[in-house]
Amino acid sequence: ALKACDSKLMHKSDAGAVIIGIGGIDHLVAAGKTLFARYPNLLIEEMVTDAVCELIVGVRQDPVIGPWMMIGSGGLYAELLADHKVVLLPVPNDDLEELINSLKINPLLKGYRGSEPADMSALLDVLQSLARFSLEKRDVLMELEINPLLVRPKGKGVCAVDAVLQYARAS
């Protein structure tokens, strides 16, 4: 996949700033010319094709309640399904699993209609890493969002496709 890197692009696919299914060097060069005409910086990424589902994961710092994490259906479904849950940090794995089980997209993670179940161990590891990072950087990190976070079949891990970090401005 080839995508534009521009801090003003929140939804790259909506802006036509992502080209997928690149089949070789000639296609890559042509795709690069197309995107370079509009964007100065591009990123080449491996195309992950075996995702069980796409999640959105965000952590934010609230001055009153402290750090919290949002988890939900991601990618194209993030806004369409309005399927997300919020939890205060830190959070034990049992509570994270319960939260994930309450999502509409959870059947996909379990292996819906004979499909492979998701790598829940890797998903929980990444969520806990994000929680720890958020707590360690609570003085400077305002927000971090990954969308989509591709959850792959058991034993294959997860893959963050796109992420946005916002740090507090120095005063």
Regions found by a protein language model. Give the residues of each.
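ATP-dependent carboxylate/acyl-activation modules
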Residues: 1-171
